[in-house]
Swiss-Prot record:
GO terms for cellular component: cytosolic large ribosomal subunit. It comes from the Bacteria. SUPFAM superfamilies: Translation proteins. Keywords: Ribonucleoprotein, Ribosomal protein, RNA-binding, rRNA-binding. Part of the 50S ribosomal subunit. Forms a cluster with proteins L14 and L19. Residues 116-148 are annotated as: Disordered. This is Large ribosomal subunit protein uL3. Belongs to the universal ribosomal protein uL3 family. GO terms for molecular function: rRNA binding; structural constituent of ribosome. One of the primary rRNA binding proteins, it binds directly near the 3'-end of the 23S rRNA, where it nucleates assembly of the 50S subunit. It comes from Streptococcus pneumoniae serotype 2 (strain D39 / NCTC 7466).
Length: 208
């Protein structure tokens, strides 16, 4: 069965194991998520739950949104997402960090930091040209392709806006769960800036 929860990235720190090994971890604060809707094959064509995270003021919600969350007896939510193939939860149920345990393998999704307009070296990792005084080629993108098509093919690696993309890191390990602080510690780094939305769910390729 799939497990999932929404949270906010707090930052990174490091912890030591009992053997003295240092592990870099990302701290994710996941206050209780509320199940707003249960979708089934009969009614919606697929099985999923819709969860809400992070309360917001009612004045920022319209009437349909208020009516939707009222079915779950909760406040309007800033973030609403779906998790497929989750069973055993009813509308109004809470999902806490205790859903996960140390040792679980998860996929973590976030929005990468925006870097603005960047060149091909930073954006795509291309090699630069000679930096000597006589060189006329330093940090340009280089060849645009062969002469014959008389055009540049779509998808050519060029300068442009970098970051701000939806990124998923697979098969990360849950190092520790702290229920009293609604915190999950995940091994390594995860995409996104501090305070950004993070989605944690059971790994699709765990054990492969």
């Amino acid at each position: 069965m799939t497990k999932g929860i929404l949270g906010k990235k707090v930052g990174m720190t490091q912890i030591f194991t009992e053997a003295g090994e240092l592990i870099p971890v990302t701290v994710i604060e996941a206050t209780p998520n509320v199940v707003l809707q249960v979708k089934t094959v009969e009614t919606d064509g697929y099985n999923a739950i819709q969860v809400g995270f992070d309360d917001k003021r009612e004045v920022l919600s319209n009437k349909p949104a208020k009516g939707h969350v009222a079915k779950a007896n909760t406040a309007p939510k800033r973030f609403i997402r779906e998790f497929k193939n989750v069973e055993g939860l009813e509308v109004g149920a809470e999902i806490t960090v205790e859903t996960f345990a140390a040792g679980d393998v998860v996929d973590v999704t976030g929005t990468s930091k925006g870097k603005g307009f960047q060149g091909v070296i930073k954006r795509h990792g291309q090699s630069r040209g000679p930096m000597a005084h006589g060189s006329r080629y330093h940090r340009r993108p280089g060849s645009m392709g062969p002469v014959a098509p008389n055009r540049v093919f779509k998808g050519k690696n060029l300068a442009g806006r970098m970051g701000g993309d939806r990124v998923t890191i697979q098969n990360l390990e849950v190092v520790q769960v702290v229920p009293e602080k609604n915190v999950i510690l995940i091994k390594g780094n995860v995409p996104g800036a501090k305070k950004s939305l993070i989605t944690i769910k059971s790994a699709v390729k765990a054990g492969k």
